[in-house]
Amino acid sequence: MKTKAVRLYGKNDLRLEEFELPQIREDEILAKVISDSICMSSYKAALQGETHKRVPNNVAENPVIIGHEFCGQIVEVGAKWQDRFHPGQKFSIQPALNQKDDPYAAPGYSFQYIGGDCQYIIIPAQVMELNCLLDYNGSAYFYGSLAEPMSCIVGGFHASYHTQQGSYVHKMGIVEGGACALLASAGPMGMGAIDYAIHGDRKPSLLVVTDIG
């Protein structure tokens, strides 16, 4: 079937094209993309092209589909996955596959037939094998697209740690009732961080937000 996509060929070389998708194999899934939010890391990949760590060196000959914050609907399921997924099912995706043999490979950077800026995609076997194709039951597709950036925000909070004098035990996340500063945080990700700080399980007593003047 034919599909349209924004494909990356190299540094500053993005092209909106129509091309033919191959027939899916028994370990693949055909899906329709409904929403895809734009990440600054996609912009970085477009600037760096094949020098980006997630973009293949042969992207000029085998272009990749850009966009990794996407949500959609399954169209056709290969035989291997028919006990887990079905046509019409809504999905979102965890693009950071973290494969042992290729840790930087990710949808939206590294694959010819899967990415968010596309009408129809072929989801490769490793996405399902690594449990990165996620069942989605939200009220709107754009919420599913925002799952990945919000997970990055939550991960950032949980990567922050505190210690007490004389102890090397790391206490992760916000200190209940403590102070929190979010720098350069009036953009989309900053707004998400503010939302999480205010509505998370542990709340700071003081939240200071700054942005670039």
Briefly describe each language-model feature range.
Residues 44-52:
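Short Gly/aromatic-enriched secondary-structure transition segments
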Residues 176-178, 183, 194-213:
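Adenosine-nucleotide cofactor-binding segment
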